């Protein structure tokens, strides 16, 4: 949407002020963590995706890593499963882990990829589970399938970036402990 109160001179000034940052971050990789609470507002989600596409179009290599806490909680509530938290972390048994994967992969990741593409970008959804990209160990037995990251293989992300796409990474990881 174009703000009609902004003149062409204003736009030129904005671009002039942005130029040093465009030059500094051109061809650099930045990781944007897009938390579930920031996804609650549809208007904010639209603006964030527009900003990500803009960064991509000016040559910044954006990696979008998303969560989905509120959406996961809503889905668990719909199936009658109450969320439990220990020290701010969701207790995740097998059933909860399945819901988390369904929400992150089947709903949020696909939605963000689609929105980026509607805004004019090219995106591919990937998971920390893909190719054991993100490995973890159990953080605390009381938390179930909640882990601490022990290794990240960035090769899949770099491959996606090299092909000119924005990787949209859902925050799931692999552990051999459970």
Regions found by a protein language model. Give the residues of each.
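Nucleotide/pyrophosphate-binding catalytic subdomain
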Residues: 1-176
């Amino acid at each position: 949407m174009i703000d009609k109160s902004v003149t062409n001179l204003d736009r030129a000034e904005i671009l002039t002020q942005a130029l040093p940052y465009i030059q500094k971050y051109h061809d650099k990789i930045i990781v944007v963590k897009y938390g579930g609470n920031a996804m609650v507002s549809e208007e904010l989600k639209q603006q964030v995706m527009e900003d990500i596409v803009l960064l991509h179009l000016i040559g910044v290599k954006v990696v979008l890593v998303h969560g989905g806490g509120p959406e996961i909680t809503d889905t668990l509530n719909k199936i009658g499963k109450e969320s439990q938290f220990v020290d701010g972390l969701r207790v995740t048994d097998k059933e909860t882990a399945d819901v988390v994967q369904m929400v992150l992969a089947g709903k949020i990741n696909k939605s963000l990829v689609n929105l980026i593409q509607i805004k004019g970008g090219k995106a591919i959804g990937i998971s920390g589970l893909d190719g054991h990209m993100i490995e973890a160990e159990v953080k605390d037995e009381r938390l179930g399938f909640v882990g601490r990251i022990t290794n990240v293989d960035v090769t899949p992300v770099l491959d996606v970036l090299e092909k000119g796409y924005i990787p949209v990474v859902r925050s799931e990881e692999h552990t051999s402990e459970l």
